[in-house]
């Protein structure tokens, strides 16, 4: 049985989070949490939050034993992009894209 958790609208680009997601895919829960705890990437915070939510869902909603769980699927989709303006000299302006992402984690036995 697979249990899902989603984190939508995380304020980080999907490209940065995918670097972290690739490291924990297929690992056991304990190993994945260790990797995320000692990672110096900003995306590790978001992935860890979503993974802990999936673990809590498995334990509370489905009564699964968390010692036997592993990260079966993890993927990161692009969210909405917020367009912002940065004023520059002589009346000009630059466009800033603030990217977001949606993180989906599935844990199973």
From Swiss-Prot:
Q: What Gene Ontology terms describe what this protein does at the molecular function level?
A: rRNA binding; structural constituent of ribosome
Instruction: Tell me which CDD domains the record gives.
Output: Ribosomal_L22
- What InterPro entries does the database record attribute to this sequence? Ribosomal_uL22, Ribosomal_uL22_bac/chlpt-type, Ribosomal_uL22_bac/org-type, Ribosomal_uL22_CS, Ribosomal_uL22_sf
Give me any GO biological process, just one: translation
Keywords tagged on the record? Ribonucleoprotein, Ribosomal protein, RNA-binding, rRNA-binding
Q: Give me the Gene Ontology terms describing cellular component.
A: cytosolic large ribosomal subunit
Family recorded in the similarity comment: Belongs to the universal ribosomal protein uL22 family.
- Subunit details: Part of the 50S ribosomal subunit.
Record-linked NCBIfam families = rplV_bact (TIGR01044)
Its annotated function is as follows: This protein binds specifically to 23S rRNA; its binding is stimulated by other ribosomal proteins, e.g. L4, L17, and L20. It is important during the early stages of 50S assembly. It makes multiple contacts with different domains of the 23S rRNA in the assembled 50S subunit and ribosome. The globular domain of the protein is located near the polypeptide exit tunnel on the outside of the subunit, while an extended beta-hairpin is found that lines the wall of the exit tunnel in the center of the 70S ribosome.
**This protein's name:** Large ribosomal subunit protein uL22
Question: Which gene is this protein's source?
Answer: rplV
């Amino acid at each position: 049985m697979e249990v899902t958790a989603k984190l939508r609208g995380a304020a980080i680009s999907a490209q940065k989070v995918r670097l972290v997601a690739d490291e924990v895919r297929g690992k056991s829960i304990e190993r994945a949490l260790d990797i995320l705890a000692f990672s110096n990437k900003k995306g590790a915070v978001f992935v860890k939050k979503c993974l802990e939510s999936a673990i809590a869902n498995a334990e509370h909603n489905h009564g699964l034993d968390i010692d036997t769980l592993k990260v079966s699927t993890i993927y990161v989709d692009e969210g909405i992009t917020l367009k912002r303006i940065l004023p520059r000299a002589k009346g000009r302006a630059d466009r800033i894209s603030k990217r977001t992402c949606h993180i989906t984690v599935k844990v199973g036995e």
